[in-house]
Amino acid sequence: MTLVSTHELDNSLSDNTKLIDASWHFLSNRSGFEEYQKEHIENAIFFDLEKNSNKQKNLPHNHFLPEKKDWEKALSKMGISNSDKIVIYDNSDLITSCRCWFQFLYFGHRPNLVFILDGGLKKWKLENKKITNKETKIKPSKYFAKENTHMIKTKLQIEENIKKKEFKLLDARSKERFYGNVKEPRPGVRSGSIEDSICLPYSECINPKDNSFLDKKIIDEKFKSLGVIDNNTVFSCGSSVTASVLGVAYSLINNKYMPIIYIGSWSEYGKIK
């Protein structure tokens, strides 16, 4: 089970669980770290998406995965060990805890030890649960990663799939962006979408009132209506962040599915040459 409820977390805060705040805001003046400093769930450790992404010079607005050694260094500095139970939350409309979840799985943390707080900080605060601004004490550790390279697709693999049609590609962006009706928010990226891809906005899997995932039955119906019924499914978006939301959603209805993401996403594929 990928999700943990606010009630479950509230009753297990004293357990040997590493709590991570993965808040990040897309093209915004808001700072996830500054907001974390002002308020967070007790003992939460901040995860910086920008610092834990591999920025390529020709694609500065994308979020490629970090190098294995950099991931090990970052998690060791955060005091996380391979045997730790991880619960991730965020205060982001984009549900960036899902991207953090994906990175943990990609770098080999056991799936049964990585969870997302359903509803994140928004739901936690709506229920008047305890928050703090106290600094979390961290004892550095030694983390060892192992890459699951089958969990990502490259641009070349996406192009080959247009001909071979070996998997379905779902795009988590809004329909307006997918159909090219609006300008892309990132500079140097054209409007539109990848040939033969299917649009399922990540927001259609989320309850906007409290940022929790919709009922499994509703999510299942959404995927089935698009012909997604097996593990040959890959997710994409603008920069491989919200694609992870669909990865989580699909894992809720298919416990044999390990998320696969086109890591370059549209900001790579749609780059204006």
Name the predicted role of every residue range:
Residues 1-6, 55, 121-195:
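Active-site neighborhoods of enzymes that stabilize oxyanions during catalysis
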Residues 24-26, 51, 174, 204:
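Short, glycine/acidic-enriched loop or turn micro-motifs at the edges of active sites
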Residues 217, 258-263, 267-273:
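Extended hydrophobic/aromatic segments used for targeting, binding, or gating
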